[in-house]
Amino acid sequence: MLKIAIPNKGSLSEAAVEILAEAGYAGRGESKTLNVYDKTNDVEFFFLRPKDIAIYVAGGQLDLGITGRDLATDSHANVEEVMSLGFGNSSFRYAAPADQKWTVEMLEGKRIATSYPNLVRDDLQARGINATVIRLDGAVEISIKLGVADAIADVVSTGRTLRKQGLATFGEVICQSEAVIVGQQGNVVDNEQKVFLRRIEGILHAQNYLMLDYNIDRVNLAASEKITPGISGPTVSPLARENWVAVRAMVPRKEANHIMDQLSELGAQAILASEIRIARL
């Protein structure tokens, strides 16, 4: 039986649960449920604090876990990324009062409040900077106004919360984060894990691609195939119309409109883009 950790709340949890449902796994049901056994797939899901997930996986109590890259790194747990999931994107950065021109070098001897102390200590050590790291479990942005810290290090998505507190980021990004699946360091992916990962990957592919269908004169087929190469080449079928063919290929969702414009200029007709629910590539 496969044992997998899922964030118990927040945006990471919502997105993870949605992907699992699309991949054919049992849902959580009640929001306070701590674990769910999916009898059909012989998988048990454990809903844990995102910060704790890497620790459980590193200890071998769980096979895989979905968490944030920043959380896994900050835990110092012996885990490795198995797959990046493309949601929950954020950056971990230093911030200080916006009316002051801060540089990272100015952190020397200062107090830095954060919920990710290990990430900060590792970065400071790499830079050769001595500073006091103050661990807080939340509302880090208010710590400067309360006189607890001189600067902060926190997760930044839109920056709206920082601006409300009169803060601005400075220095390079410490950690570029997103949701990831982690496994124990040196973990050998067995068949059960492969099935799970393949399903999740299939959902991600479906989210990132569209299926494109169009008709085109065979004279322009070679040119159109360069525009829509697909994954292993497009599917080409003859039409009743003389010298015309129907073409089907997967295209990156973000590029779909540009690709359709190019095909139109080439003389393609009946260009249709449709959603892909599940994929195996």
Curated annotation (Swiss-Prot):
InterPro entries, per database record: ATP-PRT_HisG_long, ATP_PRibTrfase_cat, ATP_PRibTrfase_CS, ATP_PRibTrfase_HisG, HisG_C, N-reg_PII-like_a/b, N-reg_PII/ATP_PRibTrfase_C
UniProt keyword Magnesium present: yes
A GO biological-process term? L-histidine biosynthetic process
Q: Spell out the SUPFAM superfamilies in the cross-references.
A: GlnB-like, Periplasmic binding protein-like II
Name a GO CC annotation attached to this entry.
Answer: cytoplasm
Alphabetically, the GO molecular function entries are: ATP binding; ATP phosphoribosyltransferase activity; magnesium ion binding
Question: What reaction is this protein's catalytic activity?
Answer: 1-(5-phospho-beta-D-ribosyl)-ATP + diphosphate = 5-phospho-alpha-D-ribose 1-diphosphate + ATP
Q: Where in the cell is it found?
A: Cytoplasm
Q: Does the keyword rRNA-binding apply?
A: no
Alphabetized UniProt keyword annotations:
Amino-acid biosynthesis, ATP-binding, Cytoplasm, Glycosyltransferase, Histidine biosynthesis, Magnesium, Metal-binding, Nucleotide-binding, Transferase
Q: Which CDD domains match?
A: PBP2_HisGL1 (cd13591)
Function of the molecule: Catalyzes the condensation of ATP and 5-phosphoribose 1-diphosphate to form N'-(5'-phosphoribosyl)-ATP (PR-ATP). Has a crucial role in the pathway because the rate of histidine biosynthesis seems to be controlled primarily by regulation of HisG enzymatic activity.
Family assignment? Belongs to the ATP phosphoribosyltransferase family. Long subfamily.
Protein name from the UniProt record:
ATP phosphoribosyltransferase
Q: Which organism is it from?
A: Corynebacterium diphtheriae (strain ATCC 700971 / NCTC 13129 / Biotype gravis)
